[in-house]
């Protein structure tokens, strides 16, 4: 179920490379990667999961509200991270020239399906 949802998000996002459903502990629940890509999507997301914990803690300390989404741009990629629950998030990597807006939309649209599947 998770793989189908992740594949749909990546396939429908122009320039989508891969997506990972992951816990804040850095353990992937499921993932989908486009073939022949030169980036280790899971490794990128594992490393950013530590940063997410710090951002979440800072937002709580400053009473900024619940974190919903983080976007990171590099000269090659865009990483979009959507928070699902207090334990899980979904992350997608898009080529720099990909359709960032559609990727965000699809991740938001499919969030409830992922949350429901997590039980």
Write out the residue ranges for each language-model feature.
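Non-catalytic interaction/Regulatory regions outside core domains
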Residues: 1-18, 22-119
């Amino acid at each position: 179920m998770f793989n189908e949802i992740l594949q749909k998000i990546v396939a429908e996002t122009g320039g989508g490379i891969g997506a990972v459903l992951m816990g804040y502990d850095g353990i992937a629940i499921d993932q989908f990667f486009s073939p022949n890509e030169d980036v280790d999507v899971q490794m990128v997301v594992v490393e950013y999961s530590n940063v997410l914990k710090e951002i979440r803690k800072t937002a709580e300390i400053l009473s900024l509200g619940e974190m919903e989404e983080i976007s990171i741009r590099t000269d090659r990629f865009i990483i979009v991270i959507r928070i699902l629950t207090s334990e899980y998030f979904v992350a997608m990597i898009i080529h720099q020239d990909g359709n960032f807006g559609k990727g965000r939309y699809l991740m938001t649209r499919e969030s409830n399906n992922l949350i429901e599947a997590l039980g």
